[in-house]
């Protein structure tokens, strides 16, 4: 069926690259990702390297379940997600049932993203108790709004003020406008996120494992491998 056609096409692309020296027609590539600036930066690097006269590339910043679905249906070659001790058992079961694999790239200590003008901005480390008075911002996950699909680490600490958003720009505007905060990997890009956002280590939370998912029946293309290498550069 469609999977066999995709595998045949992937193999044909590999052979074409091998015997034509990477020439040929319009290059196509798609990835799906949680809301990470480093995923965008790596995508920029990929286009700068392979963006010839013709190409058709896609990057989807979307919900966790949709990332899994995109790779399972082979609409995306790679999916960028994170796992931790809380969600890995459930997510690995879902990945296995969809013939997907998770490949870890980086282990990150959780950080808090806050405005540079936030009352806690001068702290070397921030605790959950100190954050209690401020709005907690997270990415909503639509129909699959389970803790296991969250883009932020699960915390046993109850958050009294919660705001859910769909996109990164809205989240950062609310961080600044409301003195809100979100929990993330701590990898920050001033060009994409702005100079007004800073990352401060969060106390008492376990590490996040950032990586990519692939389809067991698929083959990582040359573009895919180049993108993975670009990711590693930003995650160092």
Named regions from a protein language model:
Residues 26-90:
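Central regulatory/effector-binding core of bacterial HTH transcription factors
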Residues 198-236:
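A late-sequence structural motif
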């Amino acid at each position: 069926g469609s999977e066999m056609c995709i595998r045949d096409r992937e193999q044909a692309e590999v052979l074409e690259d091998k015997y034509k020296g990477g020439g040929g027609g319009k290059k196509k590539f798609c990835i799906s990702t949680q809301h990470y600036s480093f995923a965008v930066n790596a995508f920029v690097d990929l286009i700068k390297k392979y963006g010839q006269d013709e190409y058709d590339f896609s990057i989807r910043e979307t919900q966790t379940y949709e990332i899994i679905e995109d790779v399972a249906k082979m609409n995306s070659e790679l999916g960028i997600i994170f796992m931790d001790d809380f969600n890995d058992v459930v997510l690995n079961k879902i990945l296995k049932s969809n013939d997907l694999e998770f490949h870890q790239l980086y282990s990150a200590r959780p950080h808090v993203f806050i405005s540079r003008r936030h009352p806690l901005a001068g702290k070397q480390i921030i605790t959950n108790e100190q954050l209690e008075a401020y709005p907690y911002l997270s990415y909503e996950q639509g129909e699959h709004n389970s803790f296991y699909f969250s883009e932020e680490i699960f915390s046993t600490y109850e958050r009294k003020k919660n705001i859910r958003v769909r996109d990164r720009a809205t989240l950062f505007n609310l961080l600044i406008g409301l003195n809100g905060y979100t929990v993330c990997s701590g990898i920050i890009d001033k060009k994409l996120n702005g100079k007004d956002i800073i990352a401060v280590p969060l106390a008492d939370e376990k590490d996040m494992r950032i990586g990519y998912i692939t389809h067991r029946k698929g083959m990582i293309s040359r573009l895919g491998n180049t993108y993975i290498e670009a990711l590693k550069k930003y995650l160092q």
